[in-house]
Regions:
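Transmembrane-helix bundle of Major Facilitator Superfamily
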Residues: 2-164
């Protein structure tokens, strides 16, 4: 059910669709958390890595620039090679890049890792949204699903800074 379109909206298939949507929403939540959690930590990062204000702006913006620049590209890649496959590869890359942040010793390395995180987010976002859309039939259910996943993403943006 995770990646297939439901052929009917029976109570069981709807329940499975909402469970799958919860998983896809968790992916989106972590992407948005990853995007917003950094901002509170920037002063500490600047001190620890002896980074200039300009370098810290690159730390913050490299993720968004790469993410925005590649999202349409990876949407097309996901259409060609499979949304689930590309999304899962993006999740693996996001996990590895997140782990790599522990080992950075310079601001340049951190910018590179944040850029990799942007690539990973560009891989996961189009697929997760497309898969969420395909879980449901009928405009009403699709609107509810898109509202749910979008709201979860906004929660991630909102709670990221306090968690940072």
């Amino acid at each position: 059910v995770f990646v297939s379109t439901l052929t009917r909206n029976s109570p069981r298939s709807l329940r499975e669709a909402w469970i799958a949507l919860a998983g896809l929403s968790a992916v989106f939540l972590f992407e948005m958390l990853d995007n917003s959690i950094l901002n509170v930590a920037l002063p500490t990062i600047g001190r620890d890595l002896h980074a200039s204000t300009t370098a810290l702006q690159w730390v913050s913006n490299s993720y968004a620039v790469v993410f925005g620049g590649l999202m349409l590209v990876f949407g097309a890649v996901a259409d060609r090679f499979g949304r689930r496959r590309v999304m899962l590869a993006g999740l693996v890359l996001l996990g590895l890049a997140s782990l790599a942040t522990v080992f950075v010793t310079s601001v340049g390395e951190l910018i590179a890792v944040r850029s990799l995180m942007g690539v990973a987010a560009a891989m996961t976002t189009p697929g997760s949204i497309a898969l969420a859309f395909r879980l449901f039939q009928g405009d009403d259910l699709r609107v509810r699903a898109m509202t749910f996943i979008s709201t979860v993403g906004l929660v991630g943006l909102a709670v990221g800074p306090p968690l940072g």
